[in-house]
Design a protein with these regions (language model features):
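Amphipathic terminal alpha-helices
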Residues: 240-278
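Core catalytic loop region at the nicotinamide-binding pocket of NAD(P)H-dependent oxidoreductases
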Residues: 139-145, 165-179, 203-205, 256-263
Length: 278
């Protein structure tokens, strides 16, 4: 393990391992946190990518063996690339990777739309919602306070997106692709589904809105076009929005009932539901 902000350590790790494939998912991945810690965001999301790319190019020149890189980018760039420190850092990293590709590195960029699973960090709004619904269902709290509920996003299952990433790296040529479901949902839809999955019915009686929680410069709509990935990879997301939210709520209920926050049983693929894709 290495701190990607440590350029010497990261460079030494690459030289020691001499990888055939690198999947760079390291990031300050919270837009909200990027406003609070913009310097950290640049160091991890942009500068570390510059160091990694330089190390991989040096390895390739030294060994004469191709190395392939997948760089995880973000749907936030598809909105306003200057809207947040996070978006700016990811846009800059994309340029670093494309430049390296022009100089012979087999580097692909995947613009990942929101990808969820029961392992989502507690600081993210999706987990705040599923955890809150679970806590209310178990009588551990009475209300959930949220910000803006009418933003529209493309929520998918992380496991589906990992398959797309694998296919991108295995492709004959480096690719730049959006990775998402193409199915829009409001944040309110996620709230309603989570409360229904927790057995509470309508969410409205339990939810308050606080304007102070609205993020600055939040893009109203971010939804992927899944067609490029389907054409290039034969890939399309197979897990529905409802299945993902249901799985997250089920695991949060299990966490609260057992006191076990992390378990390999939480890694299971969401169960198929009878709900249509939507």
């Amino acid at each position: 393990m290495v701190d990607v902000r440590d350029a010497a350590a990261l460079t030494a790790l690459v030289a020691d391992v001499e990888p055939d494939e690198v999947y760079n998912l390291a990031a300050v991945s919270s837009v909200g946190r990027s406003w609070q810690e913009p310097e950290l965001t640049v160091a991890v999301n942009q500068t570390a990518v510059e160091v990694l790319v330089a190390a991989l190019r040096a390895q390739q020149a030294r060994t004469g063996r191709e190395v392939r890189l997948f760089q995880a980018s973000s749907a936030e760039i598809s909105g306003d690339a200057t809207a947040s420190p996070y978006a700016r850092s990811k846009a800059a990293a994309e340029e670093v990777v494309r430049d390296a590709r022009e100089h012979g590195l087999a580097a692909s960029v995947g613009r990942l739309y929101i990808h969820e699973s029961p392992l989502r960090g507690a600081a993210f709004v999706s987990r705040k919602i599923t955890r809150g619904a679970a806590e209310i269902a178990l009588g551990m709290r009475e209300r959930l306070v949220l910000g803006k509920l009418d933003v529209v996003r493309d929520w998918g299952f992380a496991g589906d997106y990992v398959e797309a990433i694998r296919l991108m790296v295995a492709a004959d040529e480096p690719l730049d692709l959006p990775i998402g479901t193409g199915r829009p949902h409001r944040l309110l839809d996620l709230v309603d589904r989570a409360f229904a999955a927790a057995g509470l019915g309508e969410a409205a009686p339990y939810v308050d809105q606080d304007p102070s929680l609205v993020r600055p410069a939040d893009t109203a709509v971010l939804v992927a076009d899944p067609a490029p990935a389907e054409r290039a990879l034969g890939w399309r997301a197979t897990t529905t929005f409802e299945e993902v939210v249901d799985a997250m709520v089920a695991v949060d209920l299990a966490r609260l009932r057992t006191g076990v926050e992390e378990s390999t049983t939480y890694l299971s693929r969401p169960a198929r539901s009878a709900h249509p894709r939507g």
